[in-house]
Amino acid sequence: LADDVTFGVAPATIVFSQLYVMEYPSFLESLRPVLPYAAFIIAAFSALRLAKFNLDERQSTSFIGVPTPANALFWGSLIVFNPEWLTVHSWSVFIILALILITSYLLVCELPLFALKFKQWSFKGNEVKYVFIAFTVIVLALAIVSEGAIGFLQAWWLIILVYVLTSLFL
């Protein structure tokens, strides 16, 4: 339950708050009172993921579906630390709603995702992990140099996106 509150309800509440205050296209104004509640799909699917995969023994060297902490980090980084893109365009609401559906699906789908678990430290057999770690360090360093500490927090949504896309093509 604590994991669902931390990694499901908390990001859902963040997304709810953003959907509540953001601009809507005029034809969606009548849905303004109800659309923010779509954010709680994140909490429901996070709970479902935790129930489905918590005792799954197939995840010893990789993950199946996006882990809830990664999903929470994605949403926190995207919404809390990158709010300016959400206020520029009224169509941003569509991006948020689409991302709610996509990320919720990725939580529970049977997609294998590499884990940063090492059985041995040699490069051979761990190439993807080491390249991903190098990518993460470079992105975070560039973000810190360009934006300072806030850049560190802003960059995580991109890192999570690359993590999922990399796993898709392995």
Tell where the protein language model's regions lie, with residue ranges:
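Multi-pass membrane catalytic core of lipid/isoprenoid biosynthesis enzymes
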Residues: 1-51
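Membrane-interfacial segments
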Residues: 18, 22-23, 54, 58, ...
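Generic hydrophobic alpha-helical membrane-segment signal
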Residues: 27, 34-40, 53, 92, ...
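N-terminal signal-anchor transmembrane alpha-helix
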Residues: 37-39, 59, 72
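Short, functionally important structural connectors and interaction interfaces within domains
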Residues: 42-45, 55-58, 100-106
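Contiguous mid-protein beta-loop-alpha structural module that forms a pocket-lining wall or clamp
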Residues: 49-55, 62
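C-terminal membrane-associated helical module and adjoining short loops/tails
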Residues: 61-170
